[in-house]
């Protein structure tokens, strides 16, 4: 290596190219590379992975724990990516190796075989493993609602109980950063009783239906009907006459995470791919209209900006994954195609968009 005298000016690296680093394809791993580029588009999560707090949380986890080993391998990738400049790329051999060892004999065994896989399924798997490595538990204390409470007070107490019950077993930076909660209201058309279900999620899946991106979301949370609903309230009222009735389901968002993944329902149950052009225009997003009216969660008023996209090019018979990535320093957009990176004017919407990563905009 050539050494320069201390008095000689050192070459200045272009900070806008720092971290614009590809990931080598290790044999049908483009789905993995696209997913990793999507997750690493979240600066707060990556910053956490490099903190002392991160190290402390893993200290008491056995070294042979598969989730810990995967998370540490991800940390290695983040360190390598953000210490390099375009046109460099990283070789994720250690990360791939840890995942392949972890999935043996599990329902995720397909991730250990060098075959094409689904980036959404891989995203859910990685978030789960990251969470498992650092999760903690706490005591769950139920909020008792007074009979004199009004509907809004009762609903907010039920929501808080639903969320607190979940995080009492699942507290982690992953949940804090990536998880939200939906409320489903099941309305029996016979006795008019409402039953509420609280469902946490780390990716909001929406159909490719409508003229605007807002309509695509609206079609996911629109009312639906079910036949043959086994209503507990009807059974209590007429225990000797147990008859199933119809019911309506109303779905609303109750709370959103600061880092929101939205997955398009591109692949149908018969395996075919929906090739609808995504109508998202790249602008800021607000989800207030999809919230339950009783929700007072602060995320109701948040505005989000797009920071990354996982794209699938091709049909259900085969294809290739790439990622779109907004640089956190320069705010320039890049297409990350395995080892290579190409600058672009802005996010590209089309038939290939599969997973969007939205980040809460700072005020």
Stretches found by the model and what they are:
Residues 24, 182-185, 224-228:
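Processing junctions and N-termini across compartments
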